[in-house]
């Protein structure tokens, strides 16, 4: 039955060449850990993507219970962690995954830098990767406020003060991010939630798509 369904879809959309192109793509010899022990460093990018997928899936689960307002945010997190089945595990995955994805991305960036993989013709992909790194940092920062506890509140105040100190654009940028330039409150929490759940993930998916397309077009650089 599944074969007939696949054949029916393939007859109309011709999807076989698409997944064949992905599945049959040969891995370069120098990135195969089975033949070169040092090739494990090429896995950092794939591991970063794997952790990112876990972050997306666990984040989708968390949004089903989280309430982004100052009266119910902390209570919703408490309920999720103590009353929802596997809630503590999923939140723990999301919490520690946020740190792990930064570590993996840092290692991936070091590998690219020290092996000179950012050089011609891959300069554009390096720029895209740096933008992904900044988006990941922003995701970690905006997600830090969402539990709405004292630690998150003071950390956000410090962050907004740093933003405000920027010349010329500091105050307008703080107002845009926080909603209210004078107090960290309901507008700040709502905006951080929207930025964390909608704006930054959209930017991340677009940049990752561009990153993967460029990798397929240009290939994986060799060792120095």
Range-by-range predicted roles:
Residues 1-224:
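Membrane-embedded alpha-helical bundles that constitute the cytochrome b-like, heme-associated redox core
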